Amino acid sequence: MLSELRKKYPITIIEVDGIKVEITRTLGSGKTLVMLPGAQGTSETFYRQILAWGSARDVVSINYPAGENASEQAKLLLRLLSSIGVEHFDVLGTSYGAYLAQWIVFLSPSSVGRMVLGNGFHDPRPAQTPEKLANLENSSPEKVKIDVVDRLEKSVESELRSSLMDLIGRGQSPQSIRDRMLAVQRAIPVPRVIFSENHILLIECDDDPLINPSMRQSIQSHYPRAKHVIVSNGGHYPYINKPDQYNDAVGYFLEI
């Protein structure tokens, strides 16, 4: 399906503030849907969703650069979107992308109609340790990527494995992987956003190996009136592992 995506919606490069950013855009007929992958992923990470929704929505999936902090990343993304004529949009983020989506809403709530937070967090501290931070700071980008790809190579053969080997192993630069993983370790809790919780969808998986039960409960408590969907056996990548269930839940919420 990645080859189908690349043929139908090839990556384009947008320059903002002197930084070149890869995006996948569909220019569909409906409202813009901004999609933000996690720390390990590219603008093509949501290939199944982009192919499913690309005609009905103007999907803009962004391989965002790592910034000084999440606030600066979000400001850059808002400037990027404005530069391509997008001022109002729905946003879907997964993992660190979900964290970043909340910063976008915090900085510019009037820009966002609905927000989908998949396998995400608002408080990163449970995922942070001094050891992880020091290891990343003391490792070269190349070493970090080698370690990530090595773990993928040892995983069970599946669509997830083959897709991530392509997206991360061949598509994501060592610097991007290290910078985003560092961003997770340096992140701070998202300030309280002024946004209707009826316009928020939380997606979690009961077997997510990266977002532990306490982090899942924390984001639910943070947005107690948000809509909430559990995808069973979706792992950390339900949009690949359980695409039908994921697409149905998100599509219903966003009225696609």
Question: Residue spans of the language-model regions?
Answer:
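Short beta-strand/loop motif that positions the catalytic acidic residue
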Residues: 196, 202-204
